């Protein structure tokens, strides 16, 4: 029988971290620092390292100390306490992911599934055909009414948001003049949407599919070359497709409150982007191609795992005046080290002063954009 090498046994220790009603088993080196341990716990718990307090035998462990120096050995049980707000993604992972506290409104509270669907009469369909606008939000619909499909190619706007619709069929391609499509708040899954139909809408400028249950966006999205606004907030997306870079007319991208871990480098091709919101995701870095977004004015990255930014972001993105980095590992002091920061700071202060001059609500307090030293 082969004997276990005692040096190997000493090279790792097995410990348990208790957090949010669950026990997290870990095998780590005794020479691992408490700071390194916190970094390992970040993707497991979604709590940023600076928001973690590790407690062993009633004492808070010091970040710079090793586990050996802290008398943490095999079999040790640590407790993790999380500071409120200091998390990436939607929040700390508590117990099992299936009962994770997600603040996602899939269907509006105003919609009662027990109520009958809105009646589609001739007056309504005549109005649809005359205006090209089909408005059926919060109509308690289980499916898209047949009368909608009878409206022909003149339809410019279709709003079927906040219903209970479970299928968007391929025949939506018949609306060749469609410019705006609102599908948010229906609980749509990946299987619910026949993407080849939507992808054929070459004139589509606005697509809202927020507050659904999508886990992936298909490569067919790249066919929507007229798209200017894309809202995929509050889904379960883990990535954005590489074909995002084909949406060269895109001006607004809202993808906050998902589970996105990385971004395609092709996003740099979306040179008209003015507003990007990626808050409450699990992103740890931005591609350097972000510096190609010369029209970027607003970039929201709050509650992510970011530790740094593209080195030339402030130098190259000369329109940037709003930056949100609260509850990340990036501090104001860190930002000030970047080339071009002073010019960026001047732009955002000028914007803030204009808001004060025009008495914009909520503009009374100047926002530094990131947290101060911690």
Swiss-Prot record:
Pfam families: LRR_14, ubiquitin. Keywords: Leucine-rich repeat, Repeat. LRR repeats lie at residues 128-151, 152-175, 177-200, 201-224, 225-248, 250-270, 272-293, 294-316, 318-340. Coiled coil: none annotated. InterPro entries: Leu-rich_rpt, Leu-rich_rpt_typical-subtyp, LRR_dom_sf, LRR_domain-containing, LRR_R13L4/SHOC2-like, Ubiquitin-like_dom, Ubiquitin-like_domsf. CDD domains: Ubl_ubiquitin_like. The keyword Repeat applies. Residues 13-87 form the Ubiquitin-like domain. This is LRR repeats and ubiquitin-like domain-containing protein At2g30105. It comes from Arabidopsis thaliana (Mouse-ear cress). The lineage of its organism: Eukaryota, Viridiplantae, Streptophyta, Embryophyta, Tracheophyta.
């Amino acid at each position: 029988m082969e004997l276990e090498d005692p040096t190997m046994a000493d090279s790792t220790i097995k410990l348990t971290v208790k957090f949010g009603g669950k026990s997290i088993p870990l095998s780590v080196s005794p020479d691992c620092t408490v700071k390194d341990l916190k970094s390992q716990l970040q993707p497991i718990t979604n709590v940023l390292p600076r928001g973690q307090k590790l407690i062993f035998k009633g004492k808070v462990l010091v970040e710079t100390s090793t586990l050996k120096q802290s008398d943490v050995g095999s079999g040790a049980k640590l407790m993790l306490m999380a500071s409120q707000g200091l998390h990436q993604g939607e929040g700390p992972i508590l117990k099992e992911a299936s009962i994770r506290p997600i603040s996602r409104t899939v269907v509006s509270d105003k919609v009662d599934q027990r109520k009958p669907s809105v009646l589609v009469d001739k007056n309504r369909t005549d109005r649809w055909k005359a205006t090209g606008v089909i408005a059926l939000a919060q109509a308690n619909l289980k499916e898209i009414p047949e009368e909608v499909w009878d409206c022909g190619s003149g339809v410019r706007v279709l709003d079927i948001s906040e219903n209970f619709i479970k299928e968007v069929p391929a025949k939506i391609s018949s609306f060749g003049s469609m410019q705006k499509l609102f599908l948010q708040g229906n609980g749509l899954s990946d299987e619910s949407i026949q993407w080849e139909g939507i992808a054929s809408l070459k004139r589509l400028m606005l697509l809202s599919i927020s507050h659904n249950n999508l886990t992936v966006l298909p490569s067919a999205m790249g066919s929507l070359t007229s798209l200017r606004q894309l809202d995929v907030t509050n889904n379960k997306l883990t990535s954005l497709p590489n074909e995002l870079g084909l949406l060269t007319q895109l001006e607004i991208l809202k993808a906050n409150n998902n589970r996105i871990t990385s971004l395609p480098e092709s996003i740099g091709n979306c040179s008209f982007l003015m507003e990007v919101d990626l808050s409450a995701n699990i992103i740890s870095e931005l591609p350097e191609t972000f510096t190609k977004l010369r029209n970027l004015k607003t970039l929201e990255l709050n509650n992510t795992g970011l530790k740094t930014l593209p080195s030339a972001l402030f130098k190259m993105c000369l329109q940037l005046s709003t930056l949100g980095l609260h509850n990340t590992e990036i501090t104001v002091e860190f930002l000030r080290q970047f080339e071009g920061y002073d010019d960026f700071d001047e732009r955002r202060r000028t914007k803030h002063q204009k808001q004060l001059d025009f008495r914009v609500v909520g503009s009374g307090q100047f926002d530094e954009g990131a947290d101060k030293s911690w």
